[in-house]
Curated annotation (Swiss-Prot):
Its main location: mitochondrion. PANTHER family: NADH-UBIQUINONE OXIDOREDUCTASE CHAIN 5. It comes from Allomyces macrogynus. The keyword Amino-acid biosynthesis does not apply. Its EC number is 7.1.1.2. Keywords: Electron transport, Membrane, Mitochondrion, Mitochondrion inner membrane, NAD, Respiratory chain, Translocase, Transmembrane, Transmembrane helix, Transport, Ubiquinone. This is NADH-ubiquinone oxidoreductase chain 5. It is a multi-pass membrane protein. GO terms for molecular function: NADH dehydrogenase (ubiquinone) activity. GO terms for cellular component: mitochondrial inner membrane. It catalyses: a ubiquinone + NADH + 5 H(+)(in) = a ubiquinol + NAD(+) + 4 H(+)(out). The gene is ND5.
Amino acid sequence: MYLTIITLPLFAFLTVGVIGRKLGVRGSQIITSLSIIISAILSLYGFYEIVLLNNLGPITIYLSPWMNVIGAHADWAFYFDSISITMCVVVSSISSLVHLYSIGYMQGDPHIQRFFSYLSLFTFFMLLLVTGNNYLLMFVGWEGIGVSSYLLINFWFTRIQANKASMQAMLVNRVGDLGFVLGLFGIFWLFGSSDYDTVGIIAYKLDEQYITIVTLFLLIAAIGKSAQLGLHTWLPSAMEGPTPVSALIHAATLVTAGVYLILRSSPLFELAPTSLICVCVIGSLTAIFAATTGLFQNDLKRVIAYSTCSQLGYMVFALGLSQYEVAFFHLFNHAYFKALLFLSAGSIIHALHDEQDMRKMGGLVNILPFTYTMILIGSLSLMALPFLTGYYSKDAILEVAYGQFLVTGTFTYWLGTITATITAFYSSKALILGFFGTPNGSKKIYNTIHEAPLIMSIPLFLLSICSIFIGYITNKHLSVIGIGSSGIISGGVGTLRDHYLGFDIEFISTSFGVQFYPLFASLLGISLALIVLKDPKKMHSIEKPEGLLNTVNITRWLSSKSYWFDNVYNTVLISGSLHFGGIFARDIDKGFLSLLGPQGLQQLLITISRFFAIKIDTGFIPHYASIIIIIPIFIILSIFI
């Protein structure tokens, strides 16, 4: 049964990819959607057996040996524990809803079969990533989701921006993939195996410096795939793909692969304090950076993309604080309300005939009441307002950060609280600009606006239910947050005893403010948005600051330009690399090395040939006769002497 969870998406991809034209549009949609839905049902049953009943324990399914050489061993084997089966539930359930949603969203597209086959391929590789029992098998899934992401972002390949975005996503992630490869080599060198259990057992006997090097390489991989500060530039650009792709890949699954990698590598990171500090700092800086950047975005999907980047920062710095259960709790909750936000945005874009600029919207609350309700639920959950899904996990992260009583804990707590204010501000901004005020779009478009069809509305409704209740259910009835073995994933992570908080997060502090600062921060962000957006034009009038002392304008200007990361990469790294490559090719490759190699050898042979031609080809028969005698004598002497 457990292997069927993985193989069904592969079956759907192969079937539709090979005979999709014969099956037709409807047949391809039925096969892919039904396969993913069955996979989701089986994942839920596996979750019931492994997590709720808790009578099976981790399940390892061994297929065959893969590699068994000196110093390296790996098998084709799959590992189902509380972490992997929960990830299977997230991936398969959201993928099934995205498949259903895409039936309506992609209606009329001439390449529907190709789109659904790509979705199924991505789902297969993501399930392979989270269920493999070793790092090498995880790497196969890691590369597979990268290729699938490229294909889906570039699905509308006739659009230049889609071509650029897919290439950017692929190239930026190459940096992270290099980190994974180096970390994988380090794991094989240190442990002789890439199995999670083997690595976790032997790690405690190795020197800290070796573990630190390996974990830093794995951190680079996580930074690339989870769009953390420095390698984040691909995520907003990836919004050029179809909106269902954004919901599946860039909100709920692919971008969480880096978080999953650190979570699986917790026995290593726990033994490398330097790496944990790096994880903590990078995550907290990513959260505040992405939030401030999202403030001044006009594209609806880009706003949600930057919010994804910011929420991933929360998860990463929670991992850096060794609070793996809380980070995984937020990963689980975030997947559902962020998928709801993206699919709701897709309904708006679908209704407005592909318009994504919020400045050209407005007044949609009476025209699209169902869509407004859905995106409102998702936004409130993102703001972490009480009793919604995001409230339980996001506040838990901030509370455990405060409970560390360390510099890193205080640093992340206050940055996270400030980020909560900004998140509430830009979420409110998106709602106000899109649904309230005077319509700013074309009258022709507004006259044809309609609600999404039923096949698109059902996934939205189901995700809204999850965005309201799933946080409460998992928090109170599944004991996701717990000390020691009380959390449902505690058996899958390795946390040092010194890193346990020693008490539940509900009792971190008796101070009223500590537990309620995040809520006050969110309410402050909503209030500021209502005040500032009375005149929305001022919000978008970003000009270059005249003086360095005008810090407000500087912040607004830098945020609106995404802190110039793309410009720096293009002008310094790319242009500099191309310039250096040109100089190297001209002076070294075609210059010095060419003189030592082909051109120099050619010239030497020509010179020698001319010398002998002049000295030997004299036209005198005695000279030729002497050469005929000398050459055989020379050959005989060279053989026998």
